[in-house]
């Protein structure tokens, strides 16, 4: 038994310059852990509450001093003396202190930072890496990275309504090789954008945010050369993959998308592509069935292996239809649909509404609940994709978590911005530590699909 001796929280800044919570934990025998809470821009309605101060005179209302105070004055006194190695008890005490379904009293940002810092302090005291502390001898699988190289939607001021276009090096033989392929493809994409005199500025997650002015003529919807911005982005990725010297497809690099469709879904139950409308001055909206057909068309025409939030979080019936249509050949990932909540994941499993769950720690708010979400997902034969948020820090916990539970996939941004690269560098360290025991599944990570 190793008792928690001290807990201290403070307000720090994330990758967007927005306040977040950092927590440090010390144990009686010298263990130390530090964790920082991430923050999302595109959020699901059922996510645990990210507690903000609301004082417009300070950080435009986004300060987190309330959450910090809750940790230091309410949570810390109750956890002092508790065994740091007993994660379930630590998390249960905090859940009981909060007493609400979505952690609206104390704030998930503070609770999560404490939960992760305690786990890190326990690993530190045992003098083992976090992934080994959580996963034991079975923790050896390096995840296939899902790298966001073109940003749209809420993550960038670009011409694209869909939020993320990602590359997945499924044909690589190791994680380090996969990362090299990804870096080279990212640089090839930058070169292509420069050649078209497009923008090479990056969005929140380090991907490019192009305007595609070279691809259309003004005031004409059909001027995207008969293609939508999503198709133009996909064409660019295929070209960049080839330019980098790799094959688009199962033997090389495949493509993943996060549509973040809840952001497009309005009260008329249609998906409105506002960025297309802004460019063309013409309305473009799709019904659920039309959206499914559109996504099916993209899958037929491009080497796409994963689609996240292809429909709105309230469109459960649509998700079931989408999964029936293309779920045998494409990973259908629920993010806003499930919000890493076992209650909603179970509902999704029963409805066959997806075949994969995105795992975002701050959506649920404790390590124990996150592990429950991963376990439930994997037992159903679905994949679990561990994910960052658009607002990040140098914290690398999710890298260890992905390896600890052999999730096989991780989504943590592009090949730029140190807050994203930190996670990849941590995975390189883990691969080096595991040495010959390290496993990289590549395409086999998609065990939920028919090969």
From Swiss-Prot:
Binds a second Mg(2+) ion via substrate during catalysis. The keyword Secreted applies. It catalyses: (2R)-2-phosphoglycerate = phosphoenolpyruvate + H2O. Mg(2+) binds at residues 258, 308, 335. The active site is at 205 (proton donor), 360 (proton acceptor). InterPro entries: Enolase, Enolase-like_C_sf, Enolase-like_N, Enolase_C, Enolase_CS, Enolase_N. It holds the Pfam family Enolase_N. Pathway: Carbohydrate degradation; glycolysis; pyruvate from D-glyceraldehyde 3-phosphate: step 4/5. Its EC number is 4.2.1.11. (2R)-2-phosphoglycerate binds at residues 163, 360, 389-390, 411. One of its GO terms (cellular component) is phosphopyruvate hydratase complex. PROSITE patterns: ENOLASE. Its cofactor is Mg(2+). Belongs to the enolase family. NCBIfam families: eno (TIGR01060). Catalyzes the reversible conversion of 2-phosphoglycerate (2-PG) into phosphoenolpyruvate (PEP). It is essential for the degradation of carbohydrates via glycolysis. This is Enolase. The lineage of its organism: Bacteria, Bacillati, Mycoplasmatota, Mollicutes, Mycoplasmataceae.
